[in-house]
A protein has these predicted regions:
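C-terminal regions of RecA-like/P-loop NTPase motor modules
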Residues: 202-252
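Short acidic catalytic loops
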Residues: 106, 112-122
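Detector for small/aliphatic-rich hydrophobic stretches
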Residues: 1-59, 72, 82-83, 244, ...
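A glycine-rich, hydrophobic loop/mini-helix early in the fold
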Residues: 36, 42-109
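Short hydrophobic alpha-helical runs that function as membrane-insertion/retention elements
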Residues: 54, 88-91, 114-116, 139-150
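Short beta-alpha junction loops
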Residues: 59-62, 120, 149-155
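Acidic, metal-coordinating catalytic cores used for nucleic-acid/nucleotide bond scission
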Residues: 95, 120-126
């Protein structure tokens, strides 16, 4: 029986969702974001996407076990700095299984440009594979969607297309004199790490953004610089007070 070693499918470049210069995420795939600023990473992608954004969560996923903070959506005032709140649809589910099912159906339908899922722990391999297939099917008759899993800690979802770690660096000096400063009155700064990707090596960037708004600016970091920044003790960091909190205020 003959064996075909070459694939007959065309190897067209996969469409991507550009975040900033030199940083892009493949569409029709599911990615993972972790780290203390992972919600900001999701909002960056939402700003770059063209179309509705579906945000799925559980009452306590990724949030402290505090009844006052349970089932609280993102603050529209904080979202408005990145994208119009009218583009967002928030859905909460009681179980992680229901959340993954809703994400799969949303990706397959292709109606949302970006589907974000907040999880209390990384999912197993089988659900992630199903999400990839659903995202590919969602681009059959139109632009392909992208999926993003928000997981605590260092992440660890199996089978994802890429894993990203984002941490704030607002009060830290830039690792190089050639990089923009992070003054509290002028710019916000983050350290972005690509921990893994199917076709790209690990890499780190120094991300800055003007507090008055505007595009993200990225500068590559030398190997090991990101680990030194994230490993600094919290007492040495002088973090500015957030001007627009992402969490909505508690109801009286």
């Amino acid at each position: 029986m003959p064996t075909h070693l070459l694939c007959r499918r065309s190897h067209k470049p996969r469409p991507t969702l550009p975040l900033t210069e030199g940083i892009a995420l493949d569409l029709a795939r599911v990615h993972e974001a972790c780290g203390p600023a992972r919600h900001s990473f999701a909002l960056w992608l939402a700003a770059a996407a063209q179309g509705p954004v579906l945000w799925l969560s559980q009452p306590q996923a990724g949030r402290p076990l505090n009844p006052a903070q349970a089932a609280r959506p993102l603050n529209p005032d904080g979202i408005a700095e990145y994208a119009s709140p009218s583009r967002f649809l928030f859905v909460q589910t009681a179980r992680a299984e229901d959340l993954l099912w809703a994400m799969e159906e949303a990706l397959r339908g292709g109606g949302a440009a970006l589907v974000v899922a907040e999880l209390a722990e990384p999912p197993a391999m089988t659900p992630v594979r199903r999400l990839h297939l659903a995202a590919e099917a969602g681009g059959t008759f139109g632009p392909a969607p992208a999926g993003l899993l928000l997981t605590p800690g260092q992440g660890g979802a199996q089978g994802i297309e890429s894993r990203w770690h984002l941490a704030p660096a607002h009060g830290l000096p830039p690792p190089s004199s050639s990089l923009p400063g992070c003054g509290a009155a002028s710019r916000e700064c983050w350290t972005l790490q690509r921990l893994r990707a199917r076709t790209l090596p690990p890499r780190s960037w120094h991300i800055t953004r003007a507090r008055a708004g505007g595009p993200l600016q990225a500068a590559p970091l030398p190997p090991g610089a990101a680990c030194q920044q994230t490993a600094r003790p919290a007492a040495s960091r002088v973090l500015p007070q957030p001007q627009s909190p992402l969490a909505a205020p508690a109801l009286p």
